[in-house]
């Protein structure tokens, strides 16, 4: 069902995407404002750093291994990104998508300046526009490349000269 009062990109203060997948990794990406600065932030936590199979929320991911990278965004770039996310129909997604237990869990949330929060999550089930949302994130921070890195084992990182 379409909202009668659609959210405008200029009303958004934070957009966050979180996933925990079968590779034993958790990923949190967000585009947000801190004061007058717009940022894109990425945090990845490999679950072998903490208790086995412990479920993590996005804030825990940022605190376990810390923020992997943070880059400034212009307000125009953030608004274009927000417009792309809203174009995926996130406002109209169900609160929860239940499906097969494929060990993939995802959450997306949008926080508005009014305090309103729009959120959706799923376990093995996805709205039809999900890949459009992933493409919007990929355009912002190369998300597909990051998710491929998440599948790498510690030995793979060492092979590429990354300390683990």
What are these regions (language model features)?
Residues 1-23, 61-69, 76, 80-164:
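Short, well-ordered, aromatic-rich surface patches in folded extracellular/luminal domains
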Residues 26-62:
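Short, flexible N-terminal segments of the mature chain
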């Amino acid at each position: 069902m379409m909202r009668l009062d659609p959210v405008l990109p200029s009303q958004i203060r934070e957009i966050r995407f979180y996933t925990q997948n079968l590779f034993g990794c958790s990923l949190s990406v967000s585009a947000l404002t801190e004061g007058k600065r717009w940022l894109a932030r990425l945090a990845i936590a490999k679950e072998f750093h903490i208790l086995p199979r412990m479920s993590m929320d996005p804030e825990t991911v940022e605190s376990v291994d810390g923020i992997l990278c943070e880059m400034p965004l212009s307000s125009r770039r953030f608004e274009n990104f927000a417009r792309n996310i809203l174009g995926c129909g996130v406002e109209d997604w169900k609160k929860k998508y239940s499906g097969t237990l494929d060990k993939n869990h995802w959450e997306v949330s949008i926080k508005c300046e009014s305090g309103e929060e729009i959120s959706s999550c799923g376990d093995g089930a996805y709205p039809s526009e999900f890949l459009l949302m992933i493409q919007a994130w990929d355009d912002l921070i190369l998300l597909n490349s990051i998710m491929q890195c998440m599948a790498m084992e510690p030995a793979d990182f060492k092979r590429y000269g990354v300390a683990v």
